[in-house]
Curated annotation (Swiss-Prot):
Gene: xylG
Organism: Yersinia pestis
Name of this chain's protein: Xylose import ATP-binding protein XylG
Signal peptide: none
Pfam families reported for this sequence: ABC_tran
Catalytic activity: D-xylose(out) + ATP + H2O = D-xylose(in) + ADP + phosphate + H(+)
Length: 510
């Protein structure tokens, strides 16, 4: 069968740096090819070349699509050829309806008069293809992330797509939403539509792919049939070494109780009769890693937001730090009590995107660098920034580079560096490795182990059960705002955690 896509000897440079170095790949119609590699490996750059974001002339090499040389000057030209890309950050206009988004820039009509009836029927057909049952007039802002993802795919299908590029499509989706998306991709494959799938979730890569292509440091390491590769094989090719144990677990001493929470309740910020956290009580000891598991909406994030003083609604309950009653209504109060937090949404709550990497790291500890007359000690601040970047292995060309320009993994490590400058006794990590590559995950896991060896208590929330089980000494399981189980992590399985989350009993301990 002739190839639908051939990329031959593609090289893309930024100055003297080769982001993509002589990469070639092929893809047949109806195939799914997964691209794997650490952040900064060149995956996204290669796809931007393919999709016309980097126009012909800005790179070396040749692209052949459907038997013809592709010389796209912009993304519109590649879309006209049948190539579409869906980014992790969705490109929908939230204030507009599903229908308006689907036809944005390609509206149907004559003489300046829109044919809304025809567009409505077409929109319904495209939504049916992705098995999404919503009214086309529904504002996108009223849809969940999984539904928005399907609208993006329907929008691509409306443009007669033949090759769909999906960049981290499930990073913010629940397990059920992910399952729906993977089913849609299988259906597209059965209809002859090819897909290039980029993801750090190797279980998904294995499940959905026909072939897996690994890129490292801008170079093509290898492409193999997915059926011949294990997750360990993929990891070894991605990082250039074998990770003997993804979740390194160093021996550490668990000490006395440092945190106790009693009868914590939190109400929905808008629908104030709804409890998001319902009578939650638990404790945490020095040097302990406490995992909190549960489905999305179970109350995990709301619980730790209360502990850090950032929950947006009304809440009540008793919090004790080292046996003393604590008042926490602001994050400043929490930090003074020795609590630091890496938030769930790093781009929204964890960084100031336009500020430099260094300025973000020291932002919460500026008092430590302030001398006489409230003047900032620049030399002292810069020294601490250099130490923090080295300790957390943050990869950046300059501490003054805007943090938004770093990869997700390096942004997360910079946020951790900011937290550690506070010398916390309790560190809360909400989805600490979401959307980051396997190498950066491993470094964060090692850091967590180092911190608990120093006696710091750590709370980890993750939607990835293997991560919770791989890191935690003890696991709290939450469901509908309540703690359903408090489990010692000894031979604990994913099945047992999910059973605890869904059972009818109010509380289980082990």
């Amino acid at each position: 069968m002739p190839y639908l896509l051939e990329m031959k000897d593609i090289t893309k440079q930024f100055g003297v740096v080769k982001a993509v170095d002589n990469i070639s790949l092929t893809l047949e119609a109806g195939q799914v090819l997964s691209l794997c590699g650490e952040n900064g490996s060149g995956k996204s750059t290669l796809m931007k070349v393919l999709c016309g974001i980097y126009p012909v002339g800005s790179y070396q090499g040749e692209i052949i699509f459907s038997g013809e040389t592709l010389q796209a000057k912009n993304i519109r030209e590649t879309e006209q050829k049948g190539i579409a890309i869906i980014h992790q950050e969705l490109a929908l206009v939230k204030q507009m309806s599903v229908l308006e988004n689907m036809f944005l820039g390609s509206e149907w009509g004559r003489f300046g008069i829109m044919d809304y009836d025809a567009m409505y029927l077409r929109c319904q057909r495209m939504l049916a293809q992705v098995k999404l049952v919503v009214d086309p007039h529904t504002p996108v802002s009223e849809l969940g992330l999984g539904q928005q993802q399907l609208v993006e795919i329907a929008k691509a299908l409306n443009k007669q797509v033949r090759l769909l590029v999906l960049d981290e499509p499930t990073a913010s989706l629940t397990e059920s939403e992910t399952a729906i998306l993977l089913d849609i991709i299988r259906d597209l494959r059965n209809h002859g539509i090819a897909c290039i799938y980029i993801s750090h979730k190797l279980n998904e890569v294995k499940e959905i792919s026909d072939h897996i292509c690994v890129i490292r440091d801008g170079r093509h390491i290898g492409t193999r049939p997915a059926s011949t590769m294990s997750e360990d094989d993929i990891i070894a090719m991605m990082v250039g070494r074998e990770l003997k144990e993804l979740y390194p677990h160093e021996a550490h001493h668990i000490g006395e109780e440092i945190l106790r929470v009693e009868n914590l309740c939190a109400w929905h910020p808008v629908n104030r009769h709804i409890r998001r956290v319902d009578d939650v009580s638990f404790s945490l000891k020095r040097g302990e890693i406490l995992g909190i598991a549960g489905l999305v909406g179970s109350g995990r994030t709301e619980t730790v937001q209360c502990l850090f003083g950032v929950y947006p609604g009304r809440w009540q309950g008793d919090i004790f730090i080292k046996g003393q009653a604590a008042t926490i209504r602001t994050c400043q109060q929490a930090m003074k009590l020795g609590i630091a937090m890496v938030p769930e949404d790093r781009k929204k709550d964890g960084i100031v995107p336009v500020m430099g990497v260094g300025a973000n790291i020291t932002l919460a500890a500026l008092d430590d660098f302030t001398g006489a007359f409230s003047l900032l000690d620049d030399a002292k601040e810069q020294s601490i920034i250099v130490q923090s970047l080295a300790r957390l292995k943050v990869k950046t060309s300059s501490s003054e580079l805007a943090i938004a320009r770093l990869s997700g993994g390096n942004q997360q490590k910079a946020i951790l560096a900011k937290c550690l400058l506070l010398n916390p006794q309790i560190l809360i990590l909400d989805e600490p490795t979401r959307g980051i590559d396997i190498g950066a995950k491993y470094e964060i896991y090692k850091l967590i182990n180092q911190l608990v060896q120093q006696g710091i208590a750590v709370i980890v929330i993750s939607s990835e059960l293997p991560e919770v089980l791989g890191l935690s000494d003890r696991v709290l399981v939450m469901h509908q705002g309540r703690i359903k189980a408090d489990l010692i992590n000894h031979n604990l399985t994913q099945e047992k955690v999910m059973e605890a989350a869904l059972r009818s009993e109010t509380h289980v301990t082990s």
